[in-house]
Amino acid sequence: MKFALVLLGVCAFYLVNATGDLETELEASELQELQEALDLIAETPLESLEAEELEEARKFKLPKINWGKLASKAKDVYKKGQKLAKNKNVKKALKYGKQLAENLAAGEVHEPGTPVGNNKCWAIGTRCTDDCDCCPEHHCHCPAKSWTFGLIPCSCQVTESDKVNKCPPAE
């Protein structure tokens, strides 16, 4: 607040001094208003401004925190997390995530989205529509139903014992 008033005073003082040559163009009332603003700033004691700021600070109070309620919410979230960890679908998703992380950390030769070989197949993690989009040693895995294709897309994955690439071999 003090800074703003000082800045306003400096600007007004500059304008009053800079308008010396332009007095003929400016109306006398405008110059009078600027001089009154400068006088008002000079008359305002800084102590009253500090008192106003202190009063505003006293009025502001931080919201009270109910620590008991917060602790019970944290406990509920922890219990839900434990329940989710036991869910078989979550375990599958975790296994999938770990597999993907291992493949990425292992320094796969091909980044997702880059063609492999002679542009005949796509790397692990790349979106696919069927097994023919993926390499022969991979398969196209769709984790969700077809109506959620846009939300959870199919991707090329490492072929496991129960999954096989059903694309006919290239000639």
Swiss-Prot record:
Q: Name one GO biological process term.
A: killing of cells of another organism
> Keyword Secreted: yes or no?
yes
Q: Which InterPro entries match?
A: OXYTX_ICK
Region called Linear cationic cytotoxin domain, residue ranges: 59-104
Q: Which UniProt keywords apply?
A: Antibiotic, Antimicrobial, Cytolysis, Disulfide bond, Knottin, Secreted, Signal, Toxin
Q: Where in the cell is it found?
A: Secreted
Cited function? Has antimicrobial, insecticidal, cytolytic and cytotoxic activity.
According to its UniProt record, which protein family does this protein belong to? Belongs to the spiderine family. Cationic/spiderine subfamily.
Quote the entry's note on domains: The presence of a 'disulfide through disulfide knot' structurally defines this protein as a knottin. The N-terminal part of the mature protein (59-105) probably forms an alpha-helix which acts as a membrane-active peptide. It is necessary and sufficient for the toxin's antimicrobial, insecticidal, cytolytic and cytotoxic activity.
Name listed for the protein in its UniProt record: Spiderine-2a
